[in-house]
Design a protein with these regions (language model features):
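N-terminal Rossmann NAD(P)H-binding glycine-rich loop of SDR-like oxidoreductase domains
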Residues: 3-21
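Conserved Rossmann-fold NAD(P)-dependent oxidoreductase catalytic core, especially the SDR/UDP-sugar
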Residues: 79-120
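SDR active-site strand-loop-helix element
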Residues: 6, 53-54, 94-100, 145-147
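Active-site Tyr-X1-5-Lys
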Residues: 119-142
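Conserved glycine-rich Rossmann-like NAD(P)H-binding loop of the short-chain dehydrogenase/reductase
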Residues: 25-32
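NAD(P)-dependent short-chain dehydrogenase/reductase
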Residues: 141-144, 148-175
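NAD(P)H-binding glycine-rich loop region in Rossmannoid oxidoreductase-like domains
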Residues: 34-80
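Catalytic loop of short-chain dehydrogenase/reductase
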Residues: 109-126, 161-162, 166-171
Length: 175
């Protein structure tokens, strides 16, 4: 099986490559694959599965410029992926990332249920809705995974949280 991981140089993409590469042909591409349709299309040809994880890091200062980059690297990338896949004679299965930012805020007394499918109101919710709408335009059976904060010893948020907790500045972790 040929698996193409878009956003494959990130934390999750590298972990998936490690997992799948012993039994499958895996091609990992960074966001530069979305520089043009002509750049993206050759990577998708002959693929059985496309995992779309690409997107600019959110954990930076939220300037207008950065928020436009975050939006474009997700929504515009999924729109380009939809266009590219529509041009393929054999359509691969597609898995797309999204974020738990889709959901509205909730508390422990009124926990949110997956069946409560109404999005929140903030920037991340609006981004997630547009991101998922673009993903749904790829295929009627696209799989959308809503990720939260990913913790790993290999990078990501855990690496940034470690020092404050180690120094005693982290708050309690509880329900």
């Amino acid at each position: 099986m040929k698996i193409v991981i878009l956003g494959g140089t990130g934390l999750i993409g590298r972990a998936l490559e490690d997992k799948f590469s012993s039994e499958h042909e895996v091609e990992c591409r960074d966001r530069s694959a979305f520089s043009s349709l002509e750049e993206l299309l050759p990577h998708l040809k002959g693929s059985d599965l496309v995992i779309q994880l690409s997107g600019s890091i959110i954990a930076k200062r939220w300037t207008k410029k950065h928020l436009r980059e975050v939006w474009s690297s997700r929504v515009d990338a999924n729109n380009m992926l939809a266009k590219a896949i529509s041009l393929l004679p054999n359509k691969p299965r597609v898995i797309c990332a999204s974020a738990v930012g889709y959901y509205p805020e909730s508390d422990c007394e009124n926990p949110l249920q997956e069946i409560d499918n109404e999005p929140g109101n903030g920037y991340l919710a609006k981004l997630s809705v547009a991101w998922e709408d673009a993903a749904k335009s790829i295929s009627s059976d696209v799989i959308i995974l809503r990720f939260g904060v990913v913790l790993s010893r290999k990078g990501g948020a855990l690496k940034q949280l470690y020092l404050p907790y180690f120094c005693g500045f982290g708050g309690p972790i509880k329900d």
